[in-house]
Every structure is written in C-alpha cells, then in structure tokens.
Amino acid sequence: MAEVHRRQHARVKGEAPAKSSTLRDEEELGMASAETLTVFLKLLAAGFYGVSSFLIVVVNKSVLTNYRFPSSLCVGLGQMVATVAVLWVGKALRVVKFPDLDRNVPRKTFPLPLLYFGNQITGLFSTKKLNLPMFTVLRRFSILFTMFAEGVLLKKTFSWGIKMTVFAMIIGAFVAASSDLAFDLEGYVFILINDVLTAANGAYVKQKLDSKELGKYGLLYYNALFMILPTLAIAYFTGDAQKAVEFEGWADTLFLLQFTLSCVMGFILMYATVLCTQYNSALTTTIVGCIKNILITYIGMVFGGDYIFTWTNFIGLNISIAGSLVYSYITFTEEQLSKQSEANNKLDIKGKGAV
C-alpha cells in the first residue's frame, strides 16, 4: 500500500512540470496576442502625435504670419482658456482626474505657471518672426539646455555619443544662422529664451510629476488657470487686446477656423503626447517629434513664403537635421540596451530565487 502511494506521489510530481509548461505556453500566447492587438493603437498614437505637433506649428504660423494677426498674447490667452475649458469639462464628465483647487495648489505648481506662460508666449512670438526652417533648427538649442537642466535638477548623465550629436545640431544651427538673409534679432532672442524656458519647464514638470501630487492633467490645468488673468492684464495694458479687437480678419471664416484650431491645439498636442508616451514610450515621442521637425523644415522652405535660400544656410540646416537623426538613433539604441539589461537582471533574480 505504501508503495502505491509512493508511485502516485511520484506521478503527480512528474506531471507538475508538464502542467506548468502548458500554463506558461498559454500565458506567452496571451501576451503575444495582446501585443498584436496594441500594434494598431501604438501606430495610431504615434501618428496622432506627429500630426498634432505638425499642425500646431503650421496653424500658429498661418495665423500670426500669413493673416498678420497682431497679438501673440491673445493667441496664447485663447490657448489657455481652451485648455482650462476642455480639462474642466473632462473632469466634470470623469474622463480625466486631478485634485480640486485649494490653498496648497499654487505652492505645488510654482514655478511652472510662470514657465508655462513664458514658454508659450515666446514660442508664439518667435513663430511669427522666424521662417519655419530657422524656427525648427533654433529649437534644437532646447535639447542642449534640457541636458543642462536635467543635469542640474535631476542629476542625470548623458553618453559621449549623445553629447556629440547635440553638438552637431548646434553647429548646424550656427552655420545656418550665419547666412540667414531673413535674420530677425527679436525672433532669435525670443526663440533662444523659449529654448531655455522649454528646458526648465520640462525638467520641473518631470520633478513635479515624480512627486505625484497633481498629476499631468492637474499641472496643465492649474498652469493655464493661474496665468489667464495675468495674461489678460498684460494684453490690456500693452494694447494687444485692443489690436486683437480691431483686427479686420474676424469676418474671414477660414481665419476663424484656424484661430480656433490654434486655441485648441495646445491641449490636443498635450493629449497626443501623453497618448504616444503611454502606448509607446518617451523615446518614440522624441523620434516622431524629430521626424516632424524635418518635415516642417523642408515644407517651410517650399511653402512657407518667407524662407530665403542660400547654400550656407541650406547646408547648416542639413547638418542640424543629420545630427537630430543620429541623436534619435543613439537614443533608441541606448533605450533598447537599457531594456535588455533590465530584462536580464530580472531573469537573474528569478534564477537565484528558484535556486
């Protein structure tokens, strides 16, 4: 009798690995199926981000340059109001969540509202003053400034390859600027200020998001909400509001459509960025942004209407573009190596646990 029990026990022990193997196979098939189902969503999210980030530059350029709308401040104000309205409705419908306003919220957001305002207004003003190729190339300084900001605020380090490609982008920008026949000092000053503010804003947003106090929607909502009244006051006292009211293009349906689109595109771009990062990664978002900038550069040369061609400028633009492509490749490679290293570490930990 004891022998029979021993045999049954041995049989059960022998079957266990087979069952475990079957379960593992089913789990792997389930994971593969889930990955297949999300491929379309990943592509859709990346495409949505690319189209959104492309449209906001083109539409802002059209409103401020082609239609000669006189007030960058009022465009920025419209974007703030649209952001607050969309997020407020989203919260009321329980589509998005963020904390209610209380006395601690200003402390939790500071200095982001000021950076948000400065970033938005300088970006719009430089869009108005610069042709699209130079705008996109000079925006690459934001990568350099972001590296400095993340190094100081987040103690982040960067590889030699990343530093060299950023250096190539900057050299290309200098070469292009040296022969920019449409040079506008105000536009250059504002785009460089915008680059600094973009870098500081990005680093502080990451710092605030890591604390998980307000979340990404809360930060965006309160950044816009806190700056509506100051922006309105500045627009009133500088005469921008009066210029906007007296603008003759309000009767033009096509202008109204583009102005409205410009107002809502700020929120749409933010949402598209979140979706792309959620379904793909921050890396994919960066690469899509890089490809978008390349398209804007070449399209701006042909259709922008304010680009003046010179060989030196053209060569500088292409040096900067080549640097951005290599930057994307190196970033992608480093990300893949990092993921592979993490996966190997997890396997090692599991192996040690099994032993």
Swiss-Prot record:
GO terms for biological process: embryonic skeletal system development; heparan sulfate proteoglycan biosynthetic process. It is found in: Golgi apparatus membrane. Signal peptide: none annotated. Residues 1-38, 90-156, 206-216, 275-280, 336-355 are cytoplasmic. Residues 1-11 have a biased composition (Basic residues). One of its GO terms (cellular component) is Golgi membrane. The keyword Transmembrane helix applies. The chain crosses the membrane at residues 39-59, 69-89, 157-177, 185-205, 217-237, 254-274, 281-303, 315-335. It catalyses: UMP(out) + UDP-N-acetyl-alpha-D-glucosamine(in) = UMP(in) + UDP-N-acetyl-alpha-D-glucosamine(out); UMP(out) + UDP-alpha-D-glucose(in) = UMP(in) + UDP-alpha-D-glucose(out). It holds the Pfam family TPT. Residues 60-68, 178-184, 238-253, 304-314 are extracellular. One of its GO terms (molecular function) is nucleotide-sugar transmembrane transporter activity. It is a multi-pass membrane protein. Residues 1-22 are annotated as: Disordered. Keywords: Antiport, Golgi apparatus, Membrane, Sugar transport, Transmembrane, Transmembrane helix, Transport. Belongs to the TPT transporter family. SLC35D subfamily. PANTHER family: SOLUTE CARRIER FAMILY 35. Nucleotide sugar antiporter transporting UDP-N-acetylglucosamine (UDP-GlcNAc) and UDP-glucose (UDP-Glc) from the cytosol into the lumen of the Golgi in exchange of UMP. By supplying UDP-N-acetylglucosamine, a donor substrate to heparan sulfate synthases, probably takes part in the synthesis of these glycoconjugates. This is Nucleotide sugar transporter SLC35D2. It comes from Pongo abelii.
